[in-house]
Amino acid sequence: MTAIDVLRSAFGGAHHWYQGTVADITADQANHLPPGIAHPIGSQMAHILHSEDMMVGMLSGAPTLWESQGWGQKLGLPMLSSQTTEGSRAFHCDPSQLNDYCQAVFAHTDGYLSGLSAEDLDRPFDLSSWGMGAMPVGQILTTMLLGNTYAHTGEISALKGTLGLKGYPF
């Protein structure tokens, strides 16, 4: 396997876990306010998808699908990647509509990954505007994007548990 094959497999796994975890979420469950300051399931779902869309767009130098394909308007949702606790807790969505955006984002990510070379993974990418300086593309993909998807999918699984639901799909 090449490094790109490994990345595509890792993202495929993360996407599989996410999709399996959210497959049975209803609108009521997605928009349920958990105790404390935790973000609702629907807000977590949208954050995972929009963050991946945004980061792949940034790394590829292309506009996000959110902008270029009008997903914000289609879904009637604001920008999603960095919401305050208050904004996340006020967020409402229809998870079945987010699934269409999910399919587009995951296909776009796989297309981006399949076009990379091993050398591209070492290319520094400037994240100074985020307070992180330059970081290799491969590190951004593994620590930021994969980490974000797995971490928030875990939160969704735990939040499902608080509703008496099975979390992960196994």
What are the residue ranges of the model-derived segments?
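N-terminal export signals and maturation junctions of secreted/periplasmic proteins
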Residues: 1-5
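A structural signal for well-ordered alpha-helices, especially hydrophobic packing surfaces
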Residues: 22, 52, 106-109, 113, ...
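Membrane-proximal, proline-rich intrinsically disordered regions
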Residues: 25-26
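Acidic/histidine-rich alpha-helical segments that form the ligand environment
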Residues: 78-123, 140-147
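A generic alpha-helix structural signal
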Residues: 22, 45, 99-102
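Short, contiguous alpha-helical
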Residues: 8-19, 29-81, 124-170
